[in-house]
Amino acid sequence: MVVLLTGLLAATGCTQPGDTRKSEAQTAPSPTTAMRLDKPKRLLDRWPESVDRSLHKTAQQNLGNLKKLLGGEPTSAIGTAYVTWEGEYLPERGWYRPAGGSTVLISGLSGTVSDPRATLNAAFANLTRLTTVAPTAPGPLGGEARCGTGQDKGTHIEACGWADNHTVALVTFIGFPAAQSRADDFRQVRSQLENPVR
């Protein structure tokens, strides 16, 4: 389904001046107040949380690998999945996924992120089924953000991630139409998940 993160990327090499400008265009200041991630009951107020154990297991494994990127212990964490269908209950799976349903995997945490760019490099380093990864606008919360697309067993995947001084997360859209980018949905999801610490 989704390639699991298995290691860190040591970022090396030279860049051209144009590369730097492109990357900087997709970077904005990180929030100055401490942030946390909160799990909504319905994603974007429309998609229910899945109870499919295999989806949750994948999200939790990705979360475990993201924890290695923090400078210390996480202050909050999310590792879950949302679906665009309600589903029919099957005891052996938890839920049955009808044909045409799409899934959103979310793996993210808050804590100390000392270098958001290097952290995001590491988060994307082993997502080998993504054929294109490019910077994207991070939205009003700032930091670094990028999205990549690929295929897994004929299913379209778009993975987007962000890192700022307080949070790092991956949002993976599985089975959505390839013709439409999920970058706007990604920014809306981030705005729903990332909130100031109270």
Predicted regions and their residues:
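N-terminal export and membrane-targeting signals
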Residues: M1-L4
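C-terminal motif of bacterial Sec signal peptides marking the signal peptidase cleavage site
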Residues: L9-G13
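N-terminal "mature-domain start" segment
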Residues: R21-T84
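Short, surface-exposed beta-strand/loop micro-motifs that present aromatic residues
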Residues: G79-R97, C147-G148, H156-W162
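A short acidic-to-branched-hydrophobic micro-motif
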Residues: V83-R117
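Short Gly/Thr-rich strand-loop-strand
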Residues: A118-I157
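A short, solvent-exposed beta-edge/loop patch
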Residues: A145-Q188
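Short, low-complexity, Pro/Ser/Thr/Gly-rich segments in the mature regions of secreted, periplasmic
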Residues: D185-R198
